Every structure is written in structure tokens, then in C-alpha cells.
């Protein structure tokens, strides 16, 4: 019996070379690095941040799948601009070439555009409280950019969309909305992001316009 398996053309294989003794084997598609941490963070702040940003912005626009969300110019532009901000951070902190980062972002977005491997936005956006965490994909780069003197307006706009995620079948979304109703967005965001209510990021998020439904 044969089984057809659908796979993605996108993959990334970065290998920590510090533990390899002798010559490094030549394997197509493998990148050997002495310190894998910058590449891990590049993946987290591009693939994870981008995927989730598309989901939250798409949900706010009333769209069902990642593929459909990326066909909406408002979602695509919002996610792309947020990734430009994380790209700036990656270039500054880890020394990545800006042009290489741009090409990497394009490959990642092309992966998400694949209609044959498209996720439901509600699945990708699940667990919004965790994703609002201080060390997570949106708040962490936003705080670090602010420490650099940058204003992460596009990441802030995505965080505003996270606050609006109210899918009734997601336990964290239900808790988030209950907290917002009881305490307001400012206190809820500060609590879940682990920052003070008067932190400039809180103000920047709340100044962002709520995404208009498509």
C-alpha cells in the first residue's frame, strides 16, 4: 500500500557545529553554525511572530484561514510591517544582514500563502494570554525595540488585535475577555505582559486602532 503525503517546500535546518568532531559532513540544505541561538530567535521572531500576527489580524477581520487572511491587504501589510520591526531587532542584536532577513521574511510569508497547507486562524491564535507574555513573540521584541529608542507601532497594533481575540471555544480567550470586562484593557495588558500599567508600550498598544472587520 502506498500513501501520499503532502509536505511543505519550506524547511530550515541549522546545525550546532560546536559539538562536531572533525570534518563537517556535506549535507544539502544544512547550515552549520557555532552559535545556534541567533537562528533560533530568527525563527521565533519571524515564523512564530508572523504566523500568530496573521492569525490575530485575520480573526479581527472576520477571516477563517491563514491563506484567506494573507489575501487581505490589511492583514498582509500589518503582519509584514510587524516582521520588519522584528527584523530590525534581529539585525541590531545578532548582526544578521538586513537583505538576508528580508529574503527570509519573504520565504516565510510564501510558506503561509500555500492554500494546500492552510491553518484555521482560531487554531493559530489560540492561547492569547500565553502569547501576550513578556518573553513571548510580540511583547518581548516590542520592549527590546523600545529600549533601542524605536517605537514598535506595528507590533503594538498586533498586540491590540490579540486583546480583541474572543473566540468562545478558547479558554484563554474567554479568560482574557472576562478580565478586560472586569478591569479594562490597560490593566489586563499590563498583567499578562508583566509590565507596569504606565509603561509606554501599554499606551502605544491602546493608541492603536482596533482592526476593522472585513
Label each residue range with its predicted role.
Residues 1-214:
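Substrate/ligand-engaging "lid" and interaction regions
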Amino acid at each position: 500500500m502506498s500513501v501520499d503525503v503532502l509536505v511543505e517546500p519550506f524547511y530550515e535546518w541549522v546545525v550546532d557545529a560546536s559539538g562536531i568532531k572533525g570534518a563537517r559532513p556535506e549535507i544539502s540544505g544544512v547550515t552549520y553554525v557555532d552559535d545556534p541561538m541567533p537562528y533560533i530567535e530568527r525563527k521565533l521572531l519571524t515564523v512564530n511572530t508572523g504566523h500568530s500576527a496573521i492569525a490575530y489580524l485575520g480573526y479581527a477581520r472576520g477571516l477563517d484561514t491563514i491563506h484567506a487572511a494573507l489575501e487581505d491587504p490589511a492583514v498582509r501589510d500589518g503582519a509584514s510591517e510587524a516582521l520588519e520591526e522584528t527584523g530590525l531587532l534581529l539585525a541590531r542584536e545578532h548582526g544578521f544582514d538586513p537583505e538576508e532577513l528580508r529574503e527570509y521574511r519573504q520565504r516565510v510569508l510564501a510558506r503561509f500563502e500555500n492554500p494546500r497547507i492552510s491553518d484555521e486562524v482560531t487554531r493559530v491564535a489560540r492561547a492569547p494570554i500565553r502569547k501576550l507574555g513578556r518573553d513571548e513573540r510580540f511583547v518581548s521584541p516590542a520592549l527590546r525595540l523600545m529600549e533601542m529608542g524605536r517605537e514598535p507601532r506595528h507590533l503594538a497594533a498586533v498586540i491590540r488585535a490579540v486583546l480583541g481575540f474572543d473566540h468562545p471555544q478558547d479558554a484563554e480567550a474567554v479568560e482574557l475577555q472576562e478580565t478586560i470586562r472586569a478591569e479594562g484593557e490597560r490593566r489586563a495588558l499590563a498583567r499578562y505582559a508583566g509590565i507596569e500599567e504606565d509603561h509606554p508600550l501599554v499606551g502605544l498598544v491602546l493608541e492603536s486602532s482596533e482592526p476593522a472587520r472585513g
